[in-house]
Structures are given as C-alpha cells and as structure tokens.
Amino acid sequence: MLQVAIAQKKFPCYYLENFRCMDGQMISSYLDIAQLNIDPQLIAKELKQLEQYIAASALPSVRWEYQIPELGEGGACSLFGYLQDEPFKLTDHVSATSQNEQKLANLQNIVNYIEQQTQVDWYGIYQAVDTAEGPQLLKLAYQGAPSRPLFPLTEAFAAGSNNVQVALSKRGRVINNVENYLAQGGEYYTCDPKVKAETCLPLFNEQHECVGIIDAEAFSNDFFDSRTLAVLVACCIKIPHFLV
C-alpha cells in the first residue's frame, strides 16, 4: 500500500493537562495523517474512558460466521434485503487460534462500546488482508444489518467505495449528508438505503501504514458531531492492538 511521508505535529504534555503525553502524541499523529480537525483533548478524554471500559468489561463471544447480502451483477453492489444461503466464514481468512479469538473478542467489545456510547446504527471494523483475489478489506467485527464481508483494495473499486478510498488515501471521511455528497459526485458504496450519514476512518500501525478502517453509519443527517467523532477516533487508536 502507498506510503506517505508525514510531518508530525507534536502537542506538548501540558496541552493535554492530566492525560499522558504518549497518548497526546498518538492522537496528534493520527489527526495529522488522517487530516481530521477534532479537539485532541476531547479524544484523550474518550481514550481514557475506553481503556477503563476495556479493563473492566468481560469479553463477548466471537462471531466466526455471519450472514451476508447477495451481490449484484459483477459483484459491485449488495442487493439489500437479499441474503446468501450460506454464511460467510471468517475462518476462511483468519485462523481460529486462541490468540486470534481473544483479539476478535476485544474488537467485538469495542464495537459494543461504540454502540453504547454513540447509538450509531451500523459500525464495523475491517482489516487489510491478502486474499486469493488480491488485497482486500476484511470485516472482522460489526453490529447492525448484514453487509458485504470483503472490499477489493483497488483504485477501480475506490471509484465507488468510500471504505476503499479511505484505506488507499489514509484520509478520514465524515459525510453528514449522504444525499448531498452523492449529488456532488462523491464516491459512495450504497448498502443500506436508510443510511443518511457515514464516517469512515483509517487504522494505522506504528509505522503509520494504513492497516484497515472503521465504518460507522447513521440513519439521520448530521449525526457525527465532535463528541461522536472523538469516540470513533479514540477507538481507532486502540483497535490496531487487536488486529489479527
């Protein structure tokens, strides 16, 4: 995947008051790379709350299989409301080891946290993986309606996919009015026609390479305010620790 040189902007320790300087550096780096304008102090507060939740909560069960929609001609679009007979098996792409099971359980725990904190209508975590068909985004954990499990990481698919565009560009996208965004010619992959707003954010490893994305969808316009975005970014900083 394309690598980009990043000029990092460091926030001094006192800028985040009672929060750790390391967290402040991670937050500032993330915002710089993803090109997002969100209050770093608010993200630091949400990150601290997330870490407290992870430490105190019991891990949920892992969903190794899930239903997926039928795909339209050429496999480009989901046929909303029509499900395939056979469930998608995550084990076709992820080994069912105890270590991977614990990581996936932690990811599902974060998904549950997002739902509790934001009441978002759909949320998913995707990891960039190599498949027989080439590099793709693989859905590891989610909540909401059935959706496609894999997105090809190609420039051609990015022309109609917000998820792939974010993964390839490493830039976050916040769309608080999908209808207006489409009318202006924006790239968008429509799965659920009820979706009115969407935020898609990249996930980075320690080398600042994009290793996946998160996707959040809401059934109302202007859903993603500063606090909701801070929760999402806090989780994006934590999620890479649990990728498989």
Show the residue positions of the predicted features.
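Short hydrophobic/aromatic beta-strand element in the GNAT-like acyltransferase core
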Residues: 122, 200, 213
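Regulatory sensory and allosteric helical modules in signal-transduction proteins
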Residues: 121, 126-186
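Feature detects long, helix-prone N-terminal segments enriched in hydrophobes
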Residues: 165-169, 194, 206, 240-243
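Sensory-domain boundary capping and coupling elements
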Residues: 204-218
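Short loop/turn motifs at secondary-structure junctions and domain boundaries
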Residues: 117, 190-195
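A short, aliphatic-rich beta-strand micro-motif
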Residues: 197-205
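Intrinsically disordered, low-complexity terminal regulatory regions
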Residues: 2-142
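Juxtadomain coupling helices with adjacent low-complexity linkers
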Residues: 23, 27-28, 32-44, 51, ...
